[in-house]
Amino acid sequence: MEPGSVENLCVVYRSHDFLVVNKHWDVRIDSKAWRETLTLQKQLRHRFPELADPDTYYGFRFCHQLDFSTSGALCVALNKAAAGSAYRCFKDRRVTKAYLALVRGHVQESRMTISYAIGKNSTEGRTHTMCIEGTQGCENPKPSLTELVVLEHGLYAGDPVSKVLLQPLTGRTHQLRVHCSALGHPIVGDLTYGHALGQEDQPFRMMLHAFYLRIPTSAECVEACTPDPFVPSLDACWSPHTLLQPLDELVQVLRAAPDPDPSEGGPGPCSPCTPLPGPGRPPPPPETEVQRASCLQWLSEWTLEPDN
């Protein structure tokens, strides 16, 4: 597999206001540490020096986060107004995200909704991790929903695994990793929430990839679909043997459903933004003072006030 480098930056969407890049695995988005030789911020500065904004700390406005170990679609706003419009889509839960993953074992149910509440793990030595409600040391668990669809069964380095599509309907820290682990099907290569097994106890990466992203802002519909990295031609350790659901059909479902417009209650200017078949996306709760303060802090360096 091609290693990450400053020159190796894949752009999958570009407009006047936004970029969507296909982040490499094991690359941080940004870092204040001088020893961090490779970050997405440095890749962007190398590729698009003219787009860097000296008024922001990192030069670029990242609309959301991806874990260090996770690859895939990540959106960058190119001006403060675009950053604000993207934030409002995230706040109103109008963003559609879908991930691909290889998980341990053969998942038997072809579709399921995972609904374990997730909270912070206060157990000594695990304070930077999350856990499901009922786990000893689980603090302030919050409702969490993930849709899972099984795509393929196969083997990874000789061990049974399943390739799945995951759609988070809420946005908890490490939600997909925690939910898969709670099912007994941890993500291959997840050394925090998974279990080392046999010959594959040190995989070259965590097998979680942000595959699809849609942000229906009022000005444009930012939509990107990244290449599937979990195919035998790219990773000889992965050997699928049973197809359960074609990925292309699920992408069509994601793209075809109407996008709800919260201001009018009807279809918005972009589509879609609805989950895969299942119980549906929970309605967004009213914005709290804490959330509003977080928004103001998030936007402060761009001097943009959120709508009242």
Swiss-Prot record:
Keywords: Acetylation. This is RNA pseudouridylate synthase domain-containing protein 1. PANTHER family: MITOCHONDRIAL RNA PSEUDOURIDINE SYNTHASE, RNA PSEUDOURIDYLATE SYNTHASE DOMAIN-CONTAINING PROTEIN 1. GO terms for biological process: enzyme-directed rRNA pseudouridine synthesis. GO terms for molecular function: pseudouridine synthase activity; RNA binding. Residues 257-292 are annotated as: Disordered. Pfam families: PseudoU_synth_2. It comes from Bos taurus (Bovine). The gene is RPUSD1.
